Amino acid sequence: SKSSAYVVQLAAFSNSDKAKQLQQKLTASGIRAYTEVLKTADGEKTRVRAGPYESRDAAEKALDRMKALGMDGVVTSR
C-alpha cells in the first residue's frame, strides 16, 4: 500500500469561510487538516479533509478523536 494513502473527509461547504473555520478547529485540536476546492454543478465547494494517514487504521483512530470533538467524517483513500 502507498504511504499516506488515507484521509478523513469531514465536510464540503459552499461557504469557504465555514470550511476554513472547521480546518482551524481541527488544527487547534492537533489534527492536521487541509481544504480543497471542488468544482460541482452547483458551483464551487470547499472540502475539508484531515490527514493524510499511512493506514486505514490510523485514519480510523483519528476519526474517533474527531467524533469525540463533536465532528463527523468518513475515511477514504486519497
Residue ranges and their predicted role:
Residues S1-V7, A11, D17-K18:
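Compositionally biased, proline/threonine/alanine/serine-rich low-complexity intrinsically disordered stretches
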Residues S14-R78:
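Extracytoplasmic
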